[in-house]
Amino acid sequence: MSCCGGNCGCGSGCQCGSGCGGCKMYPEMAEEVTTTQTVIMGVAPSKGHAEGLEAGAAAGAGAENGCKCGDNCTCNPCNCGK
């Protein structure tokens, strides 16, 4: 079985394809799967504060922290499933 379906995962910040961050993204959960539900109740900040974060995340979707995903995965360390 290839790592994350053959997606490239570089460092802690790169997430390529299907939102996967690479091999052993959560090593402590490799053997068991648990489900947790969290309910947060409170007051959220106005939309204006979050818009900058969303725009920044969209801009770095293809290459993040020097990671180029796909056939030419270039980063250190690079974890590409074959």
Curated annotation (Swiss-Prot):
Induction / repression: By sucrose starvation, heat shock and abscisic acid (ABA). Not induced by heavy metals.
One Gene Ontology MF term: metal ion binding
Tissue-level expression: Expressed in stems, leaves, rachis, inflorescences and seeds.
Intrachain disulfide bonds: none
Keyword Transcription regulation: no
Highest taxon of the lineage: Eukaryota
Keyword Glycoprotein attached: no
Keywords: Metal-binding, Metal-thiolate cluster, Stress response
Similarity field: Belongs to the metallothionein superfamily. Type 15 family.
Task performed by this protein: Metallothioneins have a high content of cysteine residues that bind various heavy metals.
Protein name: Metallothionein-like protein 2A
Species of the source: Oryza sativa subsp. japonica
